[in-house]
């Protein structure tokens, strides 16, 4: 059987995505399974993570799998100069699947080419975060009842935000309309605009976070400005609090509007939004368990 990886959402067809959404719903209805009994899952986090790592580990535990790995690269042989190739080769001897986050773009793709063990990308630099995309799409499906013809407004860091880049690819099959709100320093890279042009996806660029745009939206996708992507602290300080969503901005929004955020947040959503029924970011994070159960079982052919 040909090895299967989950490296980029661009590797997924429309049918692949719909199948994974269906499987996510199955795992939400049937949370505790024995599907990973006798399976060892390696979680290799070369970059800090809380939500993604714990979500994957919860997904594995719910499926009765066992976990090996690390969350602090400084405690591993990588800190002694071991190459990524050698780390992957060694861990492949121990595990049935490798879930990895790395600070280098393309690291997961590279890993997938040097091992026969399935690779699941838990984020590679500013490139892709496909498991987040699947849980985002599942959250949209759950809250909207459809994936088709949604108006999606994305706010904040569109340049470095790998969740944003993956989401554009994943939703491209479903005729979305996008509104992009970002300061000049964090605008969406041209390669993604070219992708949308090539796929006849309608999108609008904005610099101002206007209530009128919120009121048109089915999904409001907030993102944080990522301090770790900036070499210049002054540049970060200039843009970190440019856009802040407060509860009063939602007064005339559509009834079906839901607010998503890949988390963590650092001030771009005020705490008074948390009790608004349109806030969905905490439920969204929980959906990650089911989406990641679906991904792991899919690459293992279970």
Swiss-Prot record:
Binding site for carbamoyl phosphate: 51-52, 101, 129, 132, 263-264
InterPro entries: Asp/Orn_carbamoyltranf_P-bd, Asp/Orn_carbamoylTrfase, Asp/Orn_carbamoylTrfase_sf, Asp_carbamoyltransf, Asp_carbamoyltransf_Asp/Orn-bd
Alphabetized UniProt keyword annotations: Pyrimidine biosynthesis, Transferase
Pathway this chain belongs to: Pyrimidine metabolism; UMP biosynthesis via de novo pathway; (S)-dihydroorotate from bicarbonate: step 2/3
Gene3D superfamilies cross-referenced by the UniProt entry: Aspartate/ornithine carbamoyltransferase (3.40.50.1370)
Catalytic activity from the UniProt record: carbamoyl phosphate + L-aspartate = N-carbamoyl-L-aspartate + phosphate + H(+)
GO cellular component: cytosol
UniProt key word Zinc: no
EC number of the protein: 2.1.3.2
Gene Ontology molecular function terms on file: amino acid binding; aspartate carbamoyltransferase activity
Record-linked PROSITE patterns: CARBAMOYLTRANSFERASE
Subunit structure and binding partners: Heterododecamer (2C3:3R2) of six catalytic PyrB chains organized as two trimers (C3), and six regulatory PyrI chains organized as three dimers (R2).
Annotated family: Belongs to the aspartate/ornithine carbamoyltransferase superfamily. ATCase family.
Name of the protein: Aspartate carbamoyltransferase catalytic subunit
Species assigned in the record: Azobacteroides pseudotrichonymphae genomovar. CFP2
Lineage, broadest ranks: Bacteria, Pseudomonadati, Bacteroidota, Bacteroidia, Bacteroidales
